[in-house]
Amino acid sequence: MSVSLVVIRLELAEHSPVPAGFGFSAAAGEMSDEEIKKTTLASAVACLEGKSPGEKVAIIHQHLGRREMTDVIIETMKSNPDELKTTVEERKSSEASPTAQRSKDHSKECINAAPDSPSKQLPDQISFFSGNPSVEIVHGIMHLYKTNKMTSLKEDVRRSAMLCILTVPAAMTSHDLMKFVAPFNEVIEQMKIIRDSTPNQYMVLIKFRAQADADSFYMTCNGRQFNSIEDDVCQLVYVERAEVLKSEDGASLPVMDLTELPKCTVCLERMDESVNGILTTLCNHSFHSQCLQRWDDTTCPVCRYCQTPEPVEENKCFECGVQENLWICLICGHIGCGRYVSRHAYKHFEETQHTYAMQLTNHRVWDYAGDNYVHRLVASKTDGKIVQYECEGDTCQEEKIDALQLEYSYLLTSQLESQRIYWENKIVRIEKDTAEEINNMKTKFKETIEKCDNLEHKLNDLLKEKQSVERKCTQLNTKVAKLTNELKEEQEMNKCLRANQVLLQNKLKEEERVLKETCDQKDLQITEIQEQLRDVMFYLETQQKINHLPAETRQEIQEGQINIAMASASSPASSGGSGKLPSRKGRSKRGK
């Protein structure tokens, strides 16, 4: 269960005294008084900041509205008499300090001066205090706010050690109130009885020594009757903060996260939905539900706004639905609109020959045959003309009565006959239309049954086809899954083969390069070997030739010398012949 904590703000006039010990805050241990006041007046300071004095006064007056400051009586009752005595002395000293100081100074002057006479020894001014010392009277307005955030009633949640009894009947005296709270006298720290301009009731603030004591009092006394005779009950709320502010500080301006509780116009009590049910009317005025139940009128108690809508005519034309200028047939009860709207009443006369129709607004009867009003006209017995009939009581003649009865009988007979013919024809038409409609419905019913049968056959075929398609789809899904796995395997294998192919290509290129280098080396070696072989063959051939020469020639070759000229290239013919043999000789010589 959750409740809303309340904030009590006492807005004082400019020259009103400040009540002693009125301030209270449940969060006093968490925040200092300056921080609490700064937080409270934050929105008011923001609203009044940068405004001229005239604009500030206008804003304050606008929020104050028609509320007037009145005398607020605060009576304090403490459990300890010594504390009450100390408070009274503080009040006496604060209120009478200027007078007491002046009387003290004057008495000193009188003592220091020479006493000429006994009367000069007495002081001119003597300070005194009149009235009940525990009662304070201030001038202002009492504001009651509730927090927009709900607070739980669990034991581990911080609420407040101060409770407020919103409405105490004026017939209940202070002695009766003390009897009501007698079981909790030991845990009550102080009580403040607040009386403002609200008649026949007052408010009580009760401060306990601890929150647990306040919770116990709340659970015990909330919703409990003050006595067994009266119906008034104790309405308790937790007080989060009680503060005193001056009007020029913006005390009447709205407070952030708080909603001011209005007064019920009927009972003049504060309206709190957590305590009593609140009913808001169509004109946006709120009252206690019980108070509005006692209000016998259907209008709003404040503005006299009618809460229930006016009754609307339910009659309307049977053909077009118009609700104006309606006529009802006196024979069959058909309602139709007049000739100045859509003429449905006259069309009904043309169809049924029902002569008489009555206007619903003024109950005047119209005769369509005679084309005039007949609500006070009868036919004369002598000439049959229509004359106005006025009943004169006992002076009415029997002949006129007989004529009227006879004419009424004729009229009733003719109308009943025409009505019988009309309704018989209508019944025949209705039967004919009903028979045709029944035949049409039977035909449609047969067609619908055939369509349903065809649809059932189609549905069965489609279900079978669906089953076969589902089987095929299942098989295809299996194949697709298998092919997907094979595809993944082939892709992995292809990936591996590509990697191996790249490695083999690199190896092949390396082998080709090595082979090419080897071939080049072999070719070079072969070329060198061929040259060596050619030299060897040339040497052997030369040696053989030299061996076949005579000894003298061999001797000459051995002793011979080979001279290579510088210009051997320019004369190849001369050097070729002479150089060949020496070369051979040299070789043969080297061989030997």
UniProtKB/Swiss-Prot annotation:
The record's listing under PROSITE patterns reads: ZF_RING_2, ZF_UBP
Specify residue ranges for compositional bias: Basic and acidic residues: 80-94
Molecular function GO terms recorded: identical protein binding; nuclear localization sequence binding; nucleic acid binding; ubiquitin protein ligase activity; ubiquitin-protein transferase activity; zinc ion binding
- Please cite one Gene Ontology biological process associated with this protein: protein ubiquitination
What are the entry keywords? Coiled coil, Cytoplasm, Metal-binding, Phosphoprotein, Transferase, Ubl conjugation pathway, Zinc, Zinc-finger
Its predominant location is: cytoplasm
Cite the Gene3D superfamilies for this sequence: Zinc/RING finger domain, C3HC4 (zinc finger) (3.30.40.10)
User: Could you tell me what this protein is called?
Assistant: BRCA1-associated protein
